[in-house]
Amino acid sequence: MQCPTCQNTDSRVLESRSADTGKSVRRRRECLNCSFRFTTYERVETMPISVIKKDGSRELFNKDKLVTGISRACEKTTFSRESIINFVDSIESQIVQDSNKDIKSSQIGELILKGLRKENEVAYIRYASVYRKFNGVKDFVSTLESLKGSSKNELASIL
C-alpha cells in the first residue's frame, strides 16, 4: 500500500478489524520508510449491475439514486438517515444475490416497496404514489385499503 506522505509502497499492518458491519476490513498501517501511520479499508469488488429501464435502455446500478428516492419518501417520518442507508444496503444485497448482472428497474421498485411496506407505512404510500404514478385520490385509497385491509366505506368516512 502506498504511503500518503512519501509514496513508498512498503508498509506493515499494525492492526486489522472488521468494519462497516463486516463488509470491509479496516487496516492500520505504518510506512517502513518514514514511519507515518495511516488507515486503509478493503472491501470486496462486486460485479457491475446493469439496470434495464422501462424503455429498454440500460445504465449502471446507482445506489445514490435509491438513497435519494427513498429519502424523499421518508421526509418528515421517523425513518433516520442511517436507517435509510441500511435499508438501501439491504436492497443492494438482494439485487446482488438475485441478479446475474442485469435487473429490471421494475424489480428494484418492487423490492423497495416490499421493504418500505414492512418498515414505514407513510414512506411506502409516498414511494408508491410516485413509483406507480398515482393519478388521484382513488389510487391512494386503493393502496391504503391494501395496506390496512380496510373496506371502502371505512376509508370513505375518514376522507
Swiss-Prot record:
Its cofactor is Zn(2+). The keyword ATP-binding applies. Keywords: ATP-binding, DNA-binding, Metal-binding, Nucleotide-binding, Repressor, Transcription, Transcription regulation, Zinc, Zinc-finger. A zinc finger (unnamed) spans 3-34. One of its GO terms (biological process) is negative regulation of DNA-templated transcription. One of its GO terms (molecular function) is ATP binding. Residues 49-139 form the ATP-cone domain. Binds 1 zinc ion. It comes from the Bacteria. Belongs to the NrdR family. Negatively regulates transcription of bacterial ribonucleotide reductase nrd genes and operons by binding to NrdR-boxes. PANTHER family: TRANSCRIPTIONAL REPRESSOR NRDR. This is Transcriptional repressor NrdR. It comes from Prochlorococcus marinus subsp. pastoris (strain CCMP1986 / NIES-2087 / MED4). The lineage of its organism: Bacteria, Bacillati, Cyanobacteriota, Cyanophyceae, Synechococcales. The gene is nrdR.
